[in-house]
Every structure is written in C-alpha cells, then in structure tokens.
Amino acid sequence: MNFVNLEQIENSLRNATFCMLFLTTFLYWFYTAFYSTNPQQIINPLSLTNIKTNFTYPDGFQANNINVSTTYLPINPVLNTEREEQPEANGTNGLLGVSSLVVNLKSIAIPRIMMGVSNLLLVLLLLVRWEKSGHFPLSNLYESLMFLAWCCTFLYLLYCTSFTLLVEKMLGSLIAPCSLLMNAFATFSLPKEMQQASPLVPALQSNWLMMHVTVMIISYATLIIGSLLSILFLILFKHKKGTPKKYDNFINNLDALSYRIIGLGFPFLTIGILSGAVWANEAWGSYWSWDPKETWALLTWLVFAIYLHTRLTKGWEGEKPAIIAAVGFLVVWFCYLGVNLIGEGLHSYGFFN
C-alpha cells in the first residue's frame, strides 16, 4: 500500500471510530436508564465472592453467601425475593422464557459488541499510523489520545465479565463518552499538522519510548476508570439517605471495585515514572529535572498513594477515600492534558502545537 492509500484508510478508520463510539455511548445510556435489572443480575457470584458486607438481606435471599440487593436508580426495579423457577421448555411459559432470555442477552450484548468494534477500529487506526510513521504511535498528543481511548475501551472489555450487569452498564455509560470525547478532541481540536504522521524527533528516538509512554498511558486509563467508579459511588452515596438498606450492598460493591482497579493502575504509574527517570538520565543527563510533567506525575502518584493508604486505615472506608480518588481524577487529567497548556518544559512533544 502506498502512502496515499494509508492516509485514506486512516481517515476512514478515524471517522468510523467516532461514529461507533457515538452509537455505543447512546446505547449504554439507553440501557442503563430504561432497562430494569432484577436482583439476580446485580451480584456476580463468580467475580465478587471475595467482597464481604455486614448487610443481611431482609428475606434471607442469598447467592453463594453474597447478599443480593436491588439497584439504586431513578427508576427503581421491582424486588422479587423469591427464586424463580426455570420456565418449562414447551408451552407459553417456555416461549416467554426464551423471549425474556433473548431480550436480556441483547440488552448487554449489543453495547458490549459495539464497544469491542470500537476497540478494534482503534487498534487498526494505531496500526495504520504505525505503518505510516515507521514508529510506535505515541510521539505526540494526537497519537497518545487515540492510544488512551484504546486503553480505556480495552480495560473495560477485559473486566466487563467480572462486573455485575448493572455496574457494567453504568461503567460503559461513563467510559464510552470519555473515549468519544478523546477521539473528538484529537480529531477536531488538535492542529492538522499534529494529525499527520511524521518521523520521531531526536529526543524520542529511543527504545524507552514504547516502555515509558505505553506504561504511563495504561496507568492513566486504569486510574481514570477507577476514579470514575469512585465518583459514581459518591453520587449514589450522597443520595442514599432515606433509601432502604438493601441499596447499600450495591453501593459498597462500587467502592470495592474502584479500589481494585486503582490498585492495579498504581503499580503501572510507579513503573512509568521510574522508567521515565531512567530515560531522562540517558537523554538529558539527569534522573529528575522538576519538569512540569514530571512534577504533576509525582503529584498524581502521591494522591493515589494517599488513597491506597487511607483504604488500609480504620475509619476511612467509603466516602473519604472516594473523595481522594475523585480529586485524583482531576489530577490525572491535568497531568496528562493540563500541563501541555503551559507550553513549557522538556516534554514539548506533548504540547498542543
């Protein structure tokens, strides 16, 4: 393939990714808002068996010793505390059962498949970009935004089967628009020159490029997802006053899931900072220069280190560490994008121009 064909393919993939993410966002919002989830679908016993709560379900209904609660939604589903018998394979009950199963599968399968297609389109976009430029596509802000969007969708697809059905929909309703905004910002706001593939600048011609930048972007994506869950937890926690205690289990599971994901992203952030220090010593002769990007990366590390520490402190469960994670969400974005607005420092390849 020649360069012209690759240029056309890249433009087509970028437009297709934007459209697919837009449709995915709409579907996740639609299913989260209008699809009623029954109690049996809220707790996934295969993935949350290690989460313990002190809450006792009113009628004693349990699944693998995990209490099952209804969801906290503007539209409250009807609670059915009795186990439903499996419908017969023939007759009206059988047909209704099959119809219900088909609707249930479609409700989660369609947006999940569309998220997967979006992820695949982003992969193809990055591969075409790699072929055009001759290097791993992380040399400027445009490429890193596309890679960050891919990381967010990939992590969601990687963990979605571990989420409960409702958490999967709610998290998809957050990740899909975030990825859409990344794609839109990279496509419509950044200079056209940045969107064109170009050779690496001398400072980036190193094997550390893939190691350092890739790990940092993965850590950003993971911390963003975990922080979004903490923000969602805070919203539900604030409005749970006056609601039955049966909602507490679902809210607490959100908090526990946020902790698990942030706990995964923190080591990536640590490795990314350390690898960046080694690369800086090779390129600039110093492990640390207090560059704005370095300083804010350190602040990001400190915020989430405090978050993880408070999770181990008695009396700091729930709302307090979630507030720290919410602050971390803002710090991550400023470290990634906000610092670039300053236009100063050694990380000039990440600026907006």
Swiss-Prot record:
Q: What is the annotated localization of this protein?
A: Plastid, Chloroplast thylakoid membrane
Record carries keyword Membrane: yes
* Key words of the record: Chloroplast, Cytochrome c-type biogenesis, Membrane, Plastid, Thylakoid, Transmembrane, Transmembrane helix
Reported effect, H309E = Abrogates production of c-type holocytochrome
Provide the effect of H347 to A/E.
Answer: Abrogates production of c-type holocytochrome
What NCBIfam families does the database record attribute to this sequence?
A: cytochr_II_ccsB
Q: What is this protein called?
A: Cytochrome c biogenesis protein CcsA
Could you tell me which species this protein originates from? Chlamydomonas reinhardtii
